[in-house]
């Protein structure tokens, strides 16, 4: 195939799609150029599904090569290692709008690899990767019901910005990524500075409207490349098997879905499945029905039963009305030795959230393609298997845990203090101890309480809620605070976090086409009502940050010195700073601009270290009297330490008003004496006098 190139203007950027020259053995391969940021995105689909495959094995890997930024990786091996958090999050970002566009029965393995090969640090690779994945899949001839487009939306001064740069995002009140087909939005990921629901919805519709040019260009590229449609055909339904299964199940599933407790309901459904499949086993053997096909159709009956019941009765499987939030319990300060903690329970979803305060040196150093930087707010989400009553792998966080942690972090970012306002590194950990839907939003609520319990001056409490949707034709219902089953069997997972004032984070994943602006508007309005209700319940535990830090949290004192004085504080070979930290038991961080941060669990020790530093950096004042210690005896006088690191000479003629024949007759090393500063010359040498003090001149000052 000859090289094909398509170029179009997308916001302020020129986007170029190229195919036919690179990675020609891949099913589909596209070079995506957004100014100087260049990605190679490939898509390969297996010719057939593996024997017994019962799920769609789609994998997406986004990777940023260090050579793209002209850097060599750090570490011993000097090559890229496992996926970073950013790479994992963008991989998920690509997966989410693509997965629902494959047919339900398609089980062939599909792999998408997006490689950043050149990076302009001001143009991130996420949107280019989404565009490239859509184009590569369209070229690969898979049964992909795309293409999709993607756009990033910023918001400043009341106006939306299409595909803002990294620099522009620093001043933007919004960072929103939206992806979808020509007719429908499929995915939204965003963080915002407490914006209204109307502004958020406007950003989604703005992005969807602008991305149409991407979809049009990909369609043109596919036509020019002569891509053949997929020849995959969905397996025919076995009507006889389905009818027999429905007859055997009867109304048992409808009864099981009336059980309110999650585990009891799950056990009841499992028992029905076991009995029904057992009863049908003899006929299945005769008819040649596969056990996997029977199990799959049983799952389809579950899907239809739950959805039909909710649509017809407007009552949910746990007995709630459509807009009712589950019972909430919230407690702050549940763990005695942590810096801040909270227990948040909503129905059968529960999180213990812990906040830990550290110093600047506790921040995480990120070695990125664009350069090193430090992250001083960390949010980690853990989802152990016991939280859903199961056994499972336990260890390093999976992609889902990384994604949920990032979403919860987005939820509270808008209310966090700056490092200047609160100079601590903050780590929040959410331990999910029970889960039945919306555990990431429980993490948002719990983190808000844990941060306030730790004394972090957040601007306002934050709550989060997950919304769901059941839609058949034109009939639909929006569900507030969804259960796990409602998420699994529903058409939408729509998470919203924010304060009473506005939205701080919004994430939406839609499994079907046809989600209208009306549906999104209703979901946002219902989410706001739910969020305000949850904030009211959380207020029973804590409404404002505690005024005092935990007894076990480090106290930070910040002082500012002239940068020229830094070497005096550090001392020769670090001797001075080491002596201060050892004697006071504190931790001291010195920044290049002269900012010094002193950390200690003991406030008195921190104050002592501060006093020492102030003494070292203070200037010696001529005419002032100091109390010092004799450091060294010489024939011509004595050197006296009047401030840490500052010695002056008392000449033999200045020791006493009487004649002194031998310095050692009057002074000994270690003696404490009061001296007056006569002069500090241009070389910084200090002339002192004991005689002048005895004569009563000067103003007294003391120093250790």
Swiss-Prot record:
Its cofactor is Mg(2+). Keywords: Cytoplasm, Magnesium, Metal-binding, Nucleotidyltransferase, RNA-binding, Transferase. It is found in: Cytoplasm. It catalyses: RNA(n+1) + phosphate = RNA(n) + a ribonucleoside 5'-diphosphate. Transmembrane segments: none annotated. Belongs to the polyribonucleotide nucleotidyltransferase family. This is Polyribonucleotide nucleotidyltransferase. It comes from Xanthomonas axonopodis pv. citri (strain 306). The gene is pnp.
């Amino acid at each position: 195939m000859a090289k094909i190139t398509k170029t179009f203007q997308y916001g302020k950027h020129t986007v170029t799609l190229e195919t036919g020259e690179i990675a020609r053995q891949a099913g589909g391969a596209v070079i995506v150029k957004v100014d100087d940021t260049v990605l190679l995105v490939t898509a390969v689909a297996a010719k057939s599904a593996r024997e017994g495959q019962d799920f769609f094995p789609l994998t997406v890997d986004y990777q940023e090569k260090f050579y793209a930024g002209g850097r060599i990786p750090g570490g011993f091996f000097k090559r890229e290692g496992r996926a970073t958090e950013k790479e994992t999050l963008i991989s998920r970002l690509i997966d989410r709008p693509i997965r629902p566009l494959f047919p339900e029965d398609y089980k062939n393995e599909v792999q998408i690899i997006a490689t950043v090969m050149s990076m302009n640090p001001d143009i991130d690779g996420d949107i280019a990767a989404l565009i490239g994945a859509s184009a590569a899949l369209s070229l690969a001839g898979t049964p992909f019901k795309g293409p999709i487009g993607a756009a990033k939306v910023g918001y400043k001064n009341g106006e939306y910005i299409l595909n803002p740069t990294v620099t522009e995002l620093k001043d933007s009140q919004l960072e929103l990524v939206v992806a979808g087909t020509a007719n429908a939005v499929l995915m939204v990921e965003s963080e915002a500075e407490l914006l209204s629901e109307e502004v958020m919805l406007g950003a989604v519709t703005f992005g969807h409207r602008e991305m149409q040019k991407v979809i049009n260009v990909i369609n043109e590229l596919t036509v020019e490349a002569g891509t053949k449609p997929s020849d995959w055909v969905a397996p025919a339904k076995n009507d006889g098997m389905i009818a027999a299964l429905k007859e055997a199940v009867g109304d048992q599933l409808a009864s099981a879905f009336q059980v309110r407790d999650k585990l009891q309901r799950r056990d009841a459904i499992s028992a029905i499945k076991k009995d029904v499949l057992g009863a049908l086993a003899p006929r299945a053997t005769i008819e040649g029905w596969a056990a996997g096909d029977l199990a799959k159709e049983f799952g389809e009956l579950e899907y239809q039963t739950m959805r039909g019941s909710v649509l017809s009765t407007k009552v949910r499987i746990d007995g709630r009305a459509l807009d009712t939030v589950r019972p909430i319990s919230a407690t702050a300060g549940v763990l005695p030795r942590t810096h801040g903690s909270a227990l948040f329970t909503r129905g059968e979803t529960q999180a213990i959230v812990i906040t830990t305060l550290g110093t600047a040196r506790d921040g995480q150093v990120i070695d990125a393609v664009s350069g090193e930087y430090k992250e001083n707010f960390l949010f980690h989400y853990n989802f152990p298997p016991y939280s859903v009553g199961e056994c499972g792998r336990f260890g390093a966080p999976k992609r889902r845990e990384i994604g949920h942690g990032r979403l919860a972090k987005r939820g509270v970012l808008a209310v966090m203090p700056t490092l200047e306002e609160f100079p601590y590194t903050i780590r929040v950990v959410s331990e999910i101890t029970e889960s039945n839907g919306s555990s990431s939003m429980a993490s948002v609520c719990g983190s808000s309480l844990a941060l306030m319990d730790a004394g972090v001056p957040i601007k306002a409490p934050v709550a989060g809620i997950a919304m769901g949707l059941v839609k058949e034709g034109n009939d639909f219902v929006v569900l507030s605070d969804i259960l796990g089953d409602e998420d699994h069997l529903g058409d939408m997972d729509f998470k919203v976090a924010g304060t009473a004032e506005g939205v701080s984070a919004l994430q939406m994943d839609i499994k079907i086409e046809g989600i209208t602006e009306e549906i999104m508007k209703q979901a946002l309005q219902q989410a706001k009502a739910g969020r305000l209700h949850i904030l009211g319940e959380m207020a029973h535990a804590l409404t404002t940050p505690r005024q005092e830090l935990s007894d076990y949290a480090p106290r930070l004192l910040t002082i500012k010195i002239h940068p020229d004085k830094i070497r005096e504080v550090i001392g020769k070979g670090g001797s001075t700073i080491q002596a201060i930290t050892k004697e006071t038991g504190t931790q001291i961080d010195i920044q290049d601009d002269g900012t010094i941060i002193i950390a200690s669990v003991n406030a008195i020790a921190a104050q002592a270290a501060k006093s020492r530093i102030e003494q070292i950096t203070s200037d010696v004042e001529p005419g002032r009297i100091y109390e010092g210690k004799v450091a060294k005896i010489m024939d011509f006088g004595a050197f006296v330490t009047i401030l840490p690191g500052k010695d002056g000479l008392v000449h033999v003629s200045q020791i006493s008003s009487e004649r002194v024949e031998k310095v050692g007759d009057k002074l000994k090393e270690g003696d404490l004496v009061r001296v007056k500063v006569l002069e500090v010359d241009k070389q910084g040498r200090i002339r002192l006098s004991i005689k002048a003090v005895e004569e009563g001149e000067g103003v007294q000052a003391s120093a250790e």
